[in-house]
């Protein structure tokens, strides 16, 4: 289908490289370079240059990488999700109305980064340890959620606006 494929690294030089070559479409799998909105950087460049691309737009990616903002939006639209709080420091471990067990995650990472067996906490001491690990290792807040037991599924949506289709559910299994 496409005879001329160019690989462009998602770094500081990407903008100029996109400007140099006329692209029919960009297959965006970029994670971005730096910062909490890193996954939105390439789509924002492509929007500015009016180059079509696959995947979510810059705004969607920026919001989704912030787990707390995503959960607030889900809650606003009455989509059920686990109770949570955001911890910036160990002292925040006492400011919650959640039940154990809980799961502690970096607030602005994806693909399971920063989540280990120790992320599932059953006591205030374990909670403090995990908040400290995430705030020190990742230099960002920790998202603390009540752990929801059960099966884990992910859904993909293909298309935009009124032409979107939900693809079949995929179960995420760790066994």
Residue ranges and their predicted role:
Residues 3-85:
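Conserved N-proximal alpha/beta basic substrate-recognition cap immediately N-terminal to
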Residues 26, 53, 84, 104, ...:
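Generic preference for hydrophobic
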Residues 102-130, 152-154:
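Glycine-rich phosphate-binding loop of ATP-grasp-fold ATP-dependent ligases
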Residues 20-21, 96, 136-137:
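Alpha-helix C-cap/termination motif
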Residues 10, 89, 122-123:
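Alpha-helix N-cap recognition
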Residues 76-110:
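Rossmann-like NAD(P)H-binding beta-loop-alpha module
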Residues 124-175:
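Phosphate-binding site of ATP-dependent enzymes
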